[in-house]
Regions:
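Hinge/beta->alpha junction and helix N-cap segments in small-molecule ligand-binding domains
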Residues: 69-78, 96-107, 160-170, 186-234, ...
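Short beta-strand segments enriched in small/hydrophobic residues
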Residues: 12, 17-22, 56-72, 82, ...
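Residue-level detector of anion-binding/catalytic polar loops
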Residues: 48, 88-93, 145, 181, ...
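Flexible loop/turn connectors
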Residues: 235-348
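Alpha-helical recognition/docking segments in bacterial nutrient-uptake
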Residues: 1-5, 59-173, 241-244
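Periplasmic-binding protein-like
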Residues: 119-127, 184-187, 219, 241-253, ...
Length: 349
């Protein structure tokens, strides 16, 4: 059985391929007679347009690449689902790349450049730490439009992100309103991303507004992972603060917060009775029983939809001016924060 192409249908109907495409998508701009003729021929031939054919008519691919750090991380997996859903609504397919851990990303080095040159994407959405030098270089060298999703890069590309300074400020402000006077910041790695740095600066500024300072030794460095959060928690509770922990803790990432929460639970430290813990971002796991973490976040659906719309505006309208969209985060209060009650921690011996 012969497989007809969109060009075959256009030739048989004596119209252009673009007209056939408009009929297929039920778009305006085709008179009734021509529309009826095209539909008749499509029905007689049994023609079904492939995604490649639709792409050729549009003059570009209808596939968007989505690069995230690690799909095992709840944040990135939730982001991927939301972005894919929005792209599908707009008529685009998604190819997702999970780069892996920090070490794996460093080993792959120029993965963004390789992906953008290997595949004929209409555009790329990228959500990896902005301290990733090779990602930044890949954005500069990309063959297609790029939008950075909730990560702030010092490169000329469209960027959609939450206001990270405001996120950190809101976290510190809320802990102080609850009455906390001693604070601990799980800050992230020394080569932290721009996003992490802005959140840290916002948190410190919220203390300064009220005449407080964060002790330098209370800004704890570590990777933004559950393992790192757990290891830091164990070390802090057993070595650094064996008798009492600062009562207000801000974790600069939800994975490190989950690890810290586990360490506290294993050592009898009650959340929020002994320590209030607040973090950033809001994947579904944050609201699960036994976790129930207060957080500062922009709704994931809003952020992903905004990023997709910005990318497709550049693809479809050929917009040249770069855009930076800063979304304002909101406080989500759950069961991990409360006014301070006491500072003494249980005897773990």
């Amino acid at each position: 059985m012969r497989r007809y192409t969109i060009s075959d249908i256009a030739r048989m109907a004596d119209v252009s391929p673009a007209t056939v495409s408009r009929v297929l998508s039920n778009s305006p701009g085709v008179n009734k007679v021509k529309r009826a003729e095209v539909k008749r021929i499509i029905e007689e031939t049994g023609y079904h347009p492939s995604s490649a054919a639709r792409s050729l008519v549009r003059g570009c691919s209808n596939v968007v690449g989505l690069i995230v750090r690690d799909l095992e991380n709840q944040y990135y997996s939730a982001m991927a689902v939301c972005a894919q859903r929005r792209l599908l609504e707009r008529g685009y397919m998604t190819m997702i790349f999970s780069i892996g851990t920090k070490a794996e990303a460093e080993e792959k080095r120029d993965y963004v450049t390789e992906i953008s040159h290997k595949f004929d994407f209409a555009g790329l959405l990228i959500s990896v730490p902005s301290c990733d030098y090779f990602a930044a270089e890949g954005i500069r060298n990309s063959r297609c439009p790029v939008v950075s999703l909730n990560r702030t890069f010092d490169v000329a590309c469209d960027q959609v992100a939450q206001n990270d300074f405001q996120a950190g400020f809101l976290a510190g402000e809320y802990l102080q309103k609850l009455g906390h006077e001693s604070f601990l910041l799980l800050a992230g790695p020394a080569d932290e991303s721009v996003s992490c740095r802005f959140r840290m600066e916002g948190f410190i500024q919220s203390l300064a507004v009220n005449g407080r300072e964060l002790d330098e030794e209370n800004a704890i460095r570590g990777e933004l992972s559950m393992d790192s959060g757990y290891e830091l928690g164990v070390k802090l509770l057993e070595e650094r603060f064996p008798d009492h922990l600062p009562t207000g803790v801000f974790a600069n990432g939800n994975s490190i917060a989950l690890g810290f929460l586990k360490a506290c639970g294993e050592r009898g430290v009650r959340i929020p009775q002994d320590v209030s813990l607040i973090t950033v971002d809001n994947p579904a796991i944050m609201d699960m029983p036994g976790i129930n973490l207060s957080t500062i976040s922009v709704p994931m659906e809003q952020m992903a939809s905004e990023a997709v719309d910005v990318l497709l505006e550049r693809i479809e309208r050929k917009r040249e001016k770069k855009r930076f969209v800063a979304l304002q985060p909101e406080l989500i209060v759950r069961g991990s924060t409360a006014p301070p009650q006491r500072r003494c921690l249980p005897d773990n011996k």
